C-alpha cells in the first residue's frame, strides 16, 4: 500500500500531515531526483495550481525543492488540472505538477502529478518518488541548480487545444448558457473559451479570493447553478469543480445531469456516428439504469473500481475511448489524456447541436434506478470503518434488504476523511430506509 499517494495524488488539510510546506519541499526535491536519474541534462517540470490561497506557499516549496535537485521549473499559475496535463505533453516537459484539492474546500490542498505524456503517474514512478522522499535532501552544486521561468502563453495554448476537440464548424451561437466555475481554476479560461465559440453566457463562480473555492458553487453545489439557469431562462447550465477536471450540468428546468447521464448522451451519439470504440467504462457506483440503457443500444459496458485512474486503466486495456464516473469525471481518450471538464462539456454540446436536441431530450432513453450517496465523517483512517464488526454486519443486512432489487456500497474515500455509503434500489422508499439504517450504524461507530 502506498504510504503517501492516494487515488488522486496527495491530499489533506493545509498545515497538517503531508500538506505542509516542509513536506512539499521534500516532495519537490524527491521528484527532481527521480527525474534526473540516468540523464545528463536538467529535467523540466511544469507547476500549475488552482485558486486556493495556500497554493502560493506550496508553489514556492515545490519550486525550491525541484531547483535544489537540479530541475528546471516552468510556473503556469492558476490553470485547470487537465490544462497542465496537456501543457506537460506539448511543452515537452518531463513531468507536470498540479497544486489542488479539486472539489474540497479552501483549507484542504493537494499535489497531483502527470507524466511527460500528460497521464497520471504509474505505480512504479510513485513508489520511486516515495523512496526518494525518505532519502536525504539534495542540493546540487550551484552551477547545476535548476532555473525558473513563467510561461506566458499557456491560456492561449489550452483554448486552442480545447477548440480543436470539436469540429471546426462547431458554434454555440444562439445558445444561452450558465457557466459555474466554482471560483476555481477555470474562472478565467472557461468564460473566455465559451464566449469565443459564440455562446450567450451568464458566468458565476468567477471571482476567486483564495478562500471561496467550491464555497456554495461548482459541481458539488448544483443548487446555485440550477437557480441561475431557471432565473435567466438559459438553455442549460455547466458546472466545473475547483480544478476543472469534473463537469456536471443542469437542463433548462434546473434538473441535475450527472456523469452517468453525460456518458449516456455521448455513448449513444458516438455509436451512431462511428466514433465510439471498444467498451464504455463506468465504475462500481455507476447507476444500473445506465448499464441497461447502453445494453439496449448494443453498447458494451464494464465497471472499474472507483477513481478516474482505474477508469483510464480499464479503457486502455479494453481499447475504449469513453468512460467516467457519476461525479463528473469523464474520459474522452480520443481527445484528451485525462479527465477534462471543459473538453467533456464541449463534446456534449457538440452532440446536442448536431442532433438538434435539448439536454433533456437527449436523455429520454435513459431511465435511472433511484440511487443516493451519503458521506459519513470518520475521524480516524476511513478504511478502518469497513472492518468494524458492527459495520460489516449492518452492510450484510442492507445488502439482504435490497437483494434482487438493488445494490449497496460502503467504501472509504480516497481523497477525504469520510466513508461513502451508496444505496440503489428499484423503490425509492426501500432505498432511503436502507441507506438511513446503514448510515446510522456507521455514524455510531465513528
Curated annotation (Swiss-Prot):
The residues the record assigns to binding Mg(2+) are: 102, 241, 243, 245
Catalytic residues at 102
**Protein family:** Belongs to the phosphohexose mutase family.
Which keywords describe this protein according to UniProt? Isomerase, Magnesium, Metal-binding, Phosphoprotein
Residue positions of the PTM Phosphoserine? 102
Q: Does the keyword Phosphoprotein apply?
A: yes
Record organism: Xylella fastidiosa (strain M12)
Name recorded for this polypeptide: Phosphoglucosamine mutase
Q: Which Pfam families match?
A: PGM_PMM_I (PF02878), PGM_PMM_II (PF02879), PGM_PMM_III (PF02880), PGM_PMM_IV (PF00408)
What is a single cellular component term in the Gene Ontology annotation?
cytosol
A molecular function GO annotation: phosphoglucosamine mutase activity
Amino acid at each position: 500500500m502506498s504510504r503517501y499517494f492516494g487515488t488522486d495524488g496527495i491530499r489533506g488539510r493545509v498545515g497538517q500531515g503531508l500538506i505542509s510546506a516542509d513536506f512539499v519541499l521534500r516532495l519537490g526535491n524527491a521528484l527532481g531526483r527521480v527525474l534526473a536519474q540516468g540523464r545528463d541534462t536538467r529535467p523540466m517540470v511544469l507547476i500549475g495550481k488552482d485558486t486556493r490561497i495556500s497554493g502560493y506557499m506550496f508553489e514556492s516549496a515545490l519550486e525550491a525543492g525541484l531547483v535544489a535537485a537540479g530541475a528546471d521549473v516552468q510556473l503556469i499559475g492558476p490553470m485547470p488540472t487537465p490544462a497542465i496535463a496537456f501543457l506537460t505533453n506539448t511543452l515537452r516537459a518531463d513531468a507536470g505538477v498540479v497544486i489542488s484539492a479539486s472539489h474540497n474546500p479552501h483549507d484542504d490542498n493537494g499535489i497531483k502529478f502527470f507524466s511527460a505524456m500528460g497521464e497520471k503517474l504509474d505505480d512504479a514512478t510513485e513508489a520511486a518518488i516515495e523512496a526518494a522522499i525518505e532519502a536525504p535532501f539534495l542540493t546540487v552544486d550551484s552551477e547545476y541548480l535548476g532555473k525558473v521561468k513563467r510561461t506566458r502563453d499557456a491560456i492561449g495554448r489550452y483554448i486552442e487545444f480545447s477548440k480543436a476537440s470539436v469540429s471546426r464548424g462547431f458554434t454555440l451561437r444562439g445558445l444561452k448558457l450558465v457557466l459555474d466555475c466554482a471560483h476555481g481554476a477555470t474562472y478565467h479560461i472557461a468564460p473566455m473559451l465559451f464566449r469565443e465559440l459564440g455562446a450567450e453566457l451568464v458566468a458565476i463562480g468567477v471571482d476567486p479570493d483564495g478562500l471561496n473555492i467550491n464555497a456554495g458553487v461548482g459541481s458539488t453545489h448544483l443548487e446555485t447553478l440550477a437557480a441561475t439557469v431557471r432565473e435567466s431562462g438559459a438553455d442549460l447550465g455547466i458546472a466545473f469543480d475547483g480544478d476543472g477536471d469534473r463537469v456536471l450540468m443542469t437542463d433548462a428546468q434546473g434538473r441535475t445531469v450527472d456523469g452517468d447521464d453525460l456518458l449516456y448522451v455521448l455513448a449513444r451519439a458516438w455509436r451512431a456516428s462511428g466514433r465510439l470504440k471498444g467498451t464504455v467504462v463506468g465504475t462500481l457506483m455507476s447507476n444500473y439504469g445506465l448499464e441497461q440503457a447502453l445494453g439496449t443500444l448494443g453498447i458494451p459496458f464494464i465497471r472499474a473500481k472507483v477513481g478516474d485512474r482505474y477508469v483510464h486503466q480499464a479503457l486502455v486495456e479494453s481499447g475504449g475511448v469513453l468512460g467516467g464516473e457519476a461525479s463528473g469525471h469523464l474520459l474522452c481518450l480520443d481527445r484528451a489524456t485525462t479527465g477534462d471538464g471543459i473538453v467533456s462539456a464541449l463534446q456534449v454540446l457538440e452532440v446536442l447541436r448536431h442532433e438538434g436536441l435539448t439536454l433533456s431530450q437527449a436523455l429520454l432513453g435513459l431511465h435511472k434506478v433511484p440511487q443516493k450517496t451519503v458521506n459519513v465523517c470518520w475521524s480516524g483512517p476511513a478504511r478502518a470503518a469497513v472492518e468494524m464488526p458492527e459495520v460489516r454486519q449492518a452492510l450484510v443486512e442492507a445488502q439482504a434488504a435490497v437483494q434482487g432489487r438493488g445494490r449497496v456500497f460502503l467504501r472509504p474515500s480516497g481523497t477525504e476523511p469520510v466513508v461513502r455509503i451508496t444505496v440503489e434500489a428499484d423503490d425509492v422508499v426501500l432505498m432511503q430506509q436502507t441507506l438511513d439504517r446503514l448510515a446510522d450504524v456507521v455514524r455510531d461507530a465513528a
